[in-house]
């Protein structure tokens, strides 16, 4: 399960971790949450949807716990597998802008970037599909403004 969905888990951790060094900590927290929650998985949704939901809520909880301690939160991007430096810089900028969004907005845009359908995003976040569509439109508009500054 973990090996099959590793990419999903790392992507969520990457967006929520305050720095490159913490991504593995977040990943371990998610794996532990998946291990604990697996006996309760009823199979009513796709496994990937369940993994996304657990990963998002675990990372958000981890961020909340860390926010209780005073520290600066900054998204550090490291894409060692990306050879194109210009694309890497653009991706760095995009993730830096995304990191300034609120928790729910980050979750929504991450799922949208993964090309997840609105129904699946709704199932993961607990929002209605209509609300997901409206929020994504507003988030994309906000990102354009933030990115062009």
Annotated model-derived regions:
Residues 11, 25-32, 36, 45-57:
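Structural recognition of an alpha-helix C-terminal capping motif at a helix-to-coil junction
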Residues 40-42, 53-73, 87:
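Arg/Lys-rich amphipathic alpha helix in sigma70-family domain 2
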Residues 10-29, 40, 124, 129, ...:
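Short, charged helix-capping/linker segments at alpha-helix termini
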Residues 56, 60, 119, 125-149:
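DNA-recognition helix of helix-turn-helix
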Residues 75-99:
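Acidic, proline/glycine-rich intrinsically disordered inter-domain spacer in sigma factors
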Residues 1-11:
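A short, charge-rich alpha-helical start-of-domain segment used by transcription regulators
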Residues 2, 100-120, 149:
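Short amphipathic alpha helix immediately N-terminal
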Residues 8, 93-96, 103-107:
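Pre-recognition alpha-helix immediately N-terminal to the DNA-recognition helix
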């Amino acid at each position: 399960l973990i090996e099959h969905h590793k990419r999903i888990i790392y992507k969520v951790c990457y967006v929520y971790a305050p720095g490159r060094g913490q991504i593995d900590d977040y990943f371990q927290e998610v794996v532990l949450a998946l291990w604990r929650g697996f006996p309760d998985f009823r199979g009513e949704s796709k496994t990937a949807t369940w993994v996304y939901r657990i990963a998002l809520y675990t990372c958000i909880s981890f961020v909340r716990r860390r926010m209780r301690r005073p520290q600066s939160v900054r998204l550090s991007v490291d894409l060692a597998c990306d050879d194109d430096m210009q694309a890497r810089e653009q991706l760095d900028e995009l993730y830096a802008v995304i990191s300034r969004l609120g928790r729910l907005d980050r979750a929504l845009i991450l799922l949208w970037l993964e090309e997840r359908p609105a129904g699946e995003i709704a199932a993961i976040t607990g929002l209605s599909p209509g609300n997901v569509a409206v929020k994504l439109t507003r988030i994309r508009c906000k990102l354009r403004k933030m990115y062009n500054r």
